[in-house]
Amino acid sequence: MNLQGKKITVHDMTLRDGMHPKRHLMTLEQMKSIACGLDAAGVPLIEVTHGDGLGGSSVNYGFPAHSDEEYLGTVIPLMKQAKVSALLLPGIGTVDHLKMAKELGVHTIRVATHCTEADVSEQHIALARKLEMDTVGFLMMAHMNSPEGLVRQAKLMESYGANCVYITDSAGYMLPDDVRARLGAVRDALKPETELGFHGHHNLAMGIANSIAAVECGATRIDAASAGLGAGAGNTPMEVLVAVCDRMGIQTGVDVWAIQDVAEDLVVPIMDFPIRIDRDSLTLGYAGVYGSFLLFAKRAEQKYGVPAREILVELGRRGMVGGQEDMIEDTAITLAKARASKAQKVAA
């Protein structure tokens, strides 16, 4: 398909999804320098919150170095052209968090639910529209629903007031044909004025290919992260996406060279470990497991002696979804007991 001249909005995830591999411990200085670099490079929309969205600070998800208010209050006044977004998961974030974000100057709110649970987003989407915010519905783990099922969920979000709906490959499981089937169906079903977005992860190295497939299907908003900093093997790498789009004639408004410098000079140096496709993040994509489970599974491996890969495969078999982080430990304990029992039988 010829995409020459097509315009898209690239939406940066470095300071939100990138909080997962940073264990939510980014400093305010790191936030400032990266946000300003992205802004100067021409990135139009930058997400800033705890990795699990507004209100994510908890025992279950992890305590951040600073509050959402501090992060947002630090970044927003510095932006010269970029707008700032925030993620909100109903049940974690509340309407009070939403109002706080609006007061601080957040432009875009993304209300995220599991891909079969759009009905829990009504209160938050309706309020965001009432507050005249750019309001996005965000359907996570989209590989776990059929194209027809996603159409029903997307239309619910649209009916509540979302002016954009995202199909989100939280596990990095989808292949380009999966993306085309789902986004194509949703694009056909939504009103022409309702935007379509795609959020990818790079666990099967499909981030770029899937994003381009999404654009082919009519997506106008594409998520990516500088140097791919995000859960699992990371998000679609922003600097690569921008370069590919430039080659294809897709207009992003982002400077090809400046965005490379942000990745190389600002983001890579703050990584606690390389964001790459290792056996555990590859397992996330292969088994269709929620990306932010990775570090939890690695911690459980250290604690219970069960390989993270085994834990992740079992989580995938059980169909665990975002929000069930407590079940990772439970699963590891169950597998450890099974291993011990098997070892005893062999010894006997």
From Swiss-Prot:
Per its UniProt record, what InterPro entries does this chain match? 2-IPM_HCS-like, 4OH_2_O-val_aldolase, Aldolase_TIM, DmpG_comm, DRE_TIM_HOA, PYR_CT
Enzyme Commission (EC) number:
4.1.3.39
Can you cite a GO biological process for this protein? catabolic process
Site feature Transition state stabilizer, where = R16
Residue limits of the Pyruvate carboxyltransferase domain? 8-260
The protein's annotated catalytic reaction(s) are: (S)-4-hydroxy-2-oxopentanoate = acetaldehyde + pyruvate
Q: Which EC class does it fall in?
A: lyase
- What keywords is this UniProt entry annotated with? Aromatic hydrocarbons catabolism, Lyase, Manganese, Metal-binding, Plasmid
Where, by residue number, is the active site?
A: H20
Record: residues binding substrate: R16, D17, S170, H199, Y290
Q: Which domain of life is it from?
A: Bacteria
State where Mn(2+) binds.
Answer: D17, H199, H201
Which GO molecular function entries does the Swiss-Prot or TrEMBL record give?
2-isopropylmalate synthase activity; 4-hydroxy-2-oxovalerate aldolase activity; manganese ion binding
Q: Which Pfam family, just one, is annotated for this protein?
A: HMGL-like
Enumerate the NCBIfam families for this protein. Answer: 4OH_2_O_val_ald, PRK08195.1
Q: Which family does it belong to?
A: Belongs to the 4-hydroxy-2-oxovalerate aldolase family.
Name the HAMAP family on file: HOA
According to UniProt, the name of this protein is 4-hydroxy-2-oxovalerate aldolase 2
